[in-house]
């Protein structure tokens, strides 16, 4: 049985923010959510979050995790003091306790699984995750024997020049046999310059204690300021894009592209520069996205091309072409083999297969049939100042340039709307509708000059 305790009481002063540090976002999730997610493959029986600064705000933001338990550290007196707060709620627990920092969001689930397996296989009282840093300056060094049993931890300022050659540092992730840790936690003393209780001091009372090196030292990056948050985001993006490159996706300029973890990509998808894929987005096989596009919470079908466009909460059917400079939002449904082109905006609109909206149009609250052609400058006037109203357009209907369809309105099938028309009444099937004032010509007319008006 495994319990998880996450240290999340700190303010994060160096973030220079009113938001608790663990609630800052990294790739669409808060730091603490990422830490929690990394533990889920362990199937923990208990998940305890130790809160302090803005405790109520952290509780509120974590309501999506219904099985969490919260304990409060009213004074932030060190890591050992934080774990002491779980003693009352862990009474009678038999198993292991995994202790993690809420601001270390890049740990891989496999690393924690390996750590727990090592801990249980060797029946350790404690197992400490360590990392070999290229430049460990400022970090305490961890010393162990050839069998990876801990010998001692020495702070950087106390190391000899020879000891500073050791690159192994404490990653701040621990797995304890709870029955052993519970006995020593009350004995911790704040005998240091900071007058804090350190969890590493508890390790001195435990035996056996082993260390385990993480495979990639970037996993243990802690977030203390915005610069480190940006570094973590780049590491996270590199992981995601590397995985997709291996899976058969072409990413033409990885440094200019961002992809959320929740995105799904088919084989032979091509992502061009300056493209951003966010949220619950799915892009099917053979589609080409970008350059310069943003797609969020949308499903793009097979062999679709999206160029310099923004798509959110929408769906695009197979073999369609979107853009350049198209904006689809709020549950737009595009059929197969459609063309939606330059400077077109759609909101809450469905268009059937082989329908074209090629230029300079706004369609809102509209339903279009198949093989419809919307002329340049066509507008659905769907808002009367109070309510939104629907527009229905039948199959194979064509609207001329600069048409206005004043909703609520229905156009039948095979209708042709003359250019420049403003349509205010329903139109039956198979007709030409012209709704514009006849052109008037006044021979010999001249405008009054400005000099004449001054007289």
Swiss-Prot record:
Binding site for acetyl-CoA: 376, 382-383, 419, 436
Gene3D superfamilies with a match to the protein in the record: Hexapeptide repeat proteins, Spore Coat Polysaccharide Biosynthesis Protein SpsA, Chain A
Location relative to the cell: Cytoplasm
Alphabetized GO MF terms: glucosamine-1-phosphate N-acetyltransferase activity; magnesium ion binding; structural constituent of carboxysome shell; UDP-N-acetylglucosamine diphosphorylase activity
Region (N-acetyltransferase): 248-455
Reaction catalysed by this enzyme: alpha-D-glucosamine 1-phosphate + acetyl-CoA = N-acetyl-alpha-D-glucosamine 1-phosphate + CoA + H(+); N-acetyl-alpha-D-glucosamine 1-phosphate + UTP + H(+) = UDP-N-acetyl-alpha-D-glucosamine + diphosphate
Protein name: Bifunctional protein GlmU
Organism: Acaryochloris marina (strain MBIC 11017)
């Amino acid at each position: 049985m495994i319990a998880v305790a996450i240290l999340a009481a700190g303010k994060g002063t160096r973030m220079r923010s009113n938001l608790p540090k663990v609630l800052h976002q990294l790739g669409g999730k808060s730091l603490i959510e990422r830490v929690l997610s990394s533990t889920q493959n362990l199937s923990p029986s208990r998940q305890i979050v130790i809160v302090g600064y803005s405790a109520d705000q952290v509780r509120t933001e974590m309501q999506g995790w219904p099985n969490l338990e919260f304990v409060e550290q009213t004074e932030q007196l060190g890591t050992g003091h934080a774990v002491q707060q779980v003693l009352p709620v862990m009474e009678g627990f038999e198993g292991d306790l995994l202790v993690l920092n809420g601001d270390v969001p890049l740990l891989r689930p496999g690393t924690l699984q390996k750590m727990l397996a090592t801990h249980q296989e060797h029946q350790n009282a404690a197992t400490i995750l360590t990392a070999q840093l290229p430049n460990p300056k400022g970090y305490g060094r961890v010393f162990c024997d050839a069998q990876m049993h801990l010998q001692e931890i020495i702070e950087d300022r106390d190391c000899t020049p020879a000891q500073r050659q050791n690159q192994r540092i404490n990653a701040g992730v621990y797995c304890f046999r709870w029955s052993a840790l519970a006995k020593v936690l009350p004995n911790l003393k704040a005998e240091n310059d900071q007058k804090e209780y350190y969890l590493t001091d508890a390790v001195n009372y435990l035996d056996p204690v082993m260390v385990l090196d993480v495979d990639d030292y970037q996993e243990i990056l802690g977030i203390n300021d915005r610069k480190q948050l940006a570094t973590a985001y780049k590491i996270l993006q590199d992981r995601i894009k590397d995985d997709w490159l291996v899976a058969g996706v072409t990413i033409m300029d990885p440094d200019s592209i961002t992809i959320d973890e929740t995105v799904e990509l088919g084989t032979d998808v091509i992502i061009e520069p300056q493209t951003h894929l966010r949220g619950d987005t799915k892009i099917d096989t053979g589609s080409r996205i970008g350059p310069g596009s943003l797609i969020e919470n949308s499903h793009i079908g097979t062999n679709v091309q999206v160029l310099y466009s923004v798509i959110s909460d929408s769906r695009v059917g197979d073999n369609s072409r979107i853009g350049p400079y198209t904006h689809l939002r709020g549950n737009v449904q595009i059929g197969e083999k459609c063309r939606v082109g330059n400077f077109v905006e759609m909101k809450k609109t469905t268009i059937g297969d082989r329908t074209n909206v090629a230029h300079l149009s706004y369609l809102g609250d509209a339903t279009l049939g198949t093989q419809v052609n919307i002329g340049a400058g066509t507008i659905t006037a769907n808002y009367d100042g109070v309510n939104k109203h629907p527009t229905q357009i039948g199959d194979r209907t064509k609207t001329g340039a600069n048409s206005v369809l004043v909703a609520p309105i229905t156009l039948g099938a095979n209708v042709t709307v003359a250019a420049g028309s403003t349509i205010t009444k329903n139109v039956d099937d198979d007709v030409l509708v012209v709704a514009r004032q006849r052109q008037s010509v006044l021979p010999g007319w001249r405008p009054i000059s400005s000099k004449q008006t001054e007289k």
